[in-house]
UniProtKB/Swiss-Prot annotation:
Belongs to the succinate/malate CoA ligase beta subunit family. This is Succinate--CoA ligase [ADP-forming] subunit beta. ATP binds at K46, G53, R54, G55, E109, A112, E117. Pfam families: ATP-grasp_2, Ligase_CoA.
Amino acid sequence: MNIHEYQAKALLKSFGAPVAEGVPVLSLADVQKAIDTLPGPLWVVKSQIHAGGRGKGKFIEKEAGEKGGVRLAFNKEDVKKHAEAMLGNHLVTAQTSAAGKQVNRLYIEDGADIEKELYLSILVDRATSNVAFVVSTEGGMDIEAVAHDTPEKILTVQIDPMAGVTPADAAKINSALNLSGSAAEDGLKLYPILYKAFVEKDMAMLEVNPLIVMKDGHLRVLDAKVSFDGNALFRHPDVAALKDETEQDAKELEAAEWDLAYIALDGTIGCMVNGAGLAMATMDIIKLYGEEPANFCDVGGGAGKEKVAAAFKIIMKDPNVKGILVNIFGGIMKCDVIAEGVIAAVKETNLAVPLVVRLEGTNVDLGKKIIRESGLNVIPADDLDDAAQKIVKAVRG
């Protein structure tokens, strides 16, 4: 589960991390409160969406102007102008689709005198089963680009779960970030604070980009991105309450109610598959033949007729879907159950796009018979390659 920057900063501040004063803005009526609360003379007006690259992003609406989703204001009137330009409009970044994300919230905070920008994140290292700090002197940049172009500028520090962040660990991080003086002293305090927040709140990732050294020599968390382990939310009702459902696709929210693994994408071919590996292979082969998947949808191994029908109807709610590929390998999942669910959903939705079904595994003959005798216009496929070619051909007309 992801949260907004302002929520992440409030959480980190509660653990003792140094963050700037700021005011969340949910409507234009909140802007004056921010102006009255924050002294200036520099304010930063930030779009709050669940996507990175906001500063370099562009708004779709012309009235939002040419600037990105993070803007500096040197007087109170500019604070108001930037807020009016951004709130309610759609921001496109490198991490959004071409349709962008609507900016429903802003965060207005005090500006900072920046001397140096650094990168710091905490994550679970799957290879070592430890929590690890990943740090770099190249802050404020796309860390993936740094990893690709100059991997030697990134250092990973493994943390012993029995000891936590030791003075030796903190010294390694300080050395990697070339910190000295007050900044190094701040680091000795900050790293254990961030680690404690990460562990106690069951975070999946904590990214501070940038972590800045200010001109007075002290550290500050300038931007923060936090995601949580969804499986642990039952232990943290305070964290679960931070969820902003407007940031999620409505189809994804409905899929979650059915315990379906569904992710909306930008293509035109809807996919319903059982098993994450098979789902990814299905999307890959669709791309291989020149089209794009409209979604990732894994119905799981033990889905019943109702769950299958629900998945099908969720896929159909995407207006970009021009065809659907059902690709099922029946192990625990039975092909006849899939067939019954698909038929029920097709009848309820009055399907008007091509449908290709590939079934293999448990009760496959019965499943094929059910589809064949349904009288519906379903295109059968013998294998995955055949299915992909048929749905691509059908979509292209």
